Amino acid sequence: MLKGLLSVLLVMVALSSALGKPEKTTPKKEKEKRVPQTLSRGWGDQLIWAQTYEEALFWSRSKNKPLMVIFHLEDCPHSQALKKAFAEDKEIQKLADEDFVILNLVYETTDKHLSPDGQYVPRIIFVDPSMTVRADITGRYSNRMYAYEPADMKLLLSNMQRALKFLKTEL
């Protein structure tokens, strides 16, 4: 009787283990590769980005480098176009990496000096290490003074160099 019970138990264990195996499925390939979300938000993944405005001001002051603040929205087509042009421009990426503290924000800060002509996106504002907002460094539009478009990369590069020159003559 005991042998019969053991054989039934053994058969049941074998059946349950055979039936309990998961089906072999091939992993489905994702149609679109998702890029991990970093502080760069696509503006330059190899760059070191500050996380908050306060942290950026601290880095700017301690490293004696100007701060470049980029205001944008993830779902804004103008912001997306500027982001693509900014990320693909090797000169801008190199200058930003070597000589600037950089921060990109998808929200407004409490510092009203960062929106001298209104809150719109995309806009780029420069702040020197003495924490002075550089309102004199503007884009090419009179109604949105700090706005840049993908075609304005040469102007942005020129303004970045201007922010560095003023920094050296002011300090």
From Swiss-Prot:
It comes from the Eukaryota. GO terms for molecular function: identical protein binding. Expressed in most developing organs which contain mucus-secreting cells, including the epidermis, olfactory bulbs, otic vesicles, pharynx, esophagus, pneumatic duct, swim bladder, and intestine. Expressed in the gill, pharynx/esophagus, swim bladder/pneumatic duct, and intestine in the adult. Its main location: secreted. It is found in: Secreted; Endoplasmic reticulum. The keyword Nucleotide-binding does not apply. Pfam families: Thioredoxin_7. A motif (Homodimer stabilization) lies at residues 40-49, 55-62. Residues 1-20 form the signal peptide. Keywords: Endoplasmic reticulum, Secreted, Signal. One of its GO terms (biological process) is positive regulation of cell-substrate adhesion. One of its GO terms (cellular component) is extracellular region. Belongs to the AGR family. Monomer and homodimer. This is Anterior gradient protein 2 homolog. It comes from Danio rerio (Zebrafish).
